[in-house]
């Protein structure tokens, strides 16, 4: 009789997460973030989450890879084209900044800089592991 093997994959949540509240459109907010943090976030294809019952949810998505530090920065809108939330338990947050492979940047300093922008009402850092919908942030 053949044995069944079960493969379990553990997702990697090793990234920093900042939530931003803003009434600005994504491209205007992105411009302000680029100026304040000396980044070059660029719009790429929308981040899609498959939805079995309805049309796929698409979230505005920006990306920047710093070749010098090898850090990846992402700006993603928390609300889709279908008015669904990427992270429903944080429904007051309008955007998330995700930083992967961060070994140099002090997140609290980054949050402080973001809070000085006219386009940002407030910003918070989050522990990714505290979020129920954290798997939506794996891309």
Predicted segment positions?
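Long, folded non-catalytic interaction modules
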Residues: 8, 23, 32, 67, ...
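Short, flexible, solvent-exposed loop/turn segments with mixed acidic/basic and small polar residues
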Residues: 4-12, 83-91
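Short, well-structured beta-strand/strand-turn elements
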Residues: 38-48
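Terminal intrinsically disordered, low-complexity, charge-rich regions
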Residues: 13, 42, 134-135
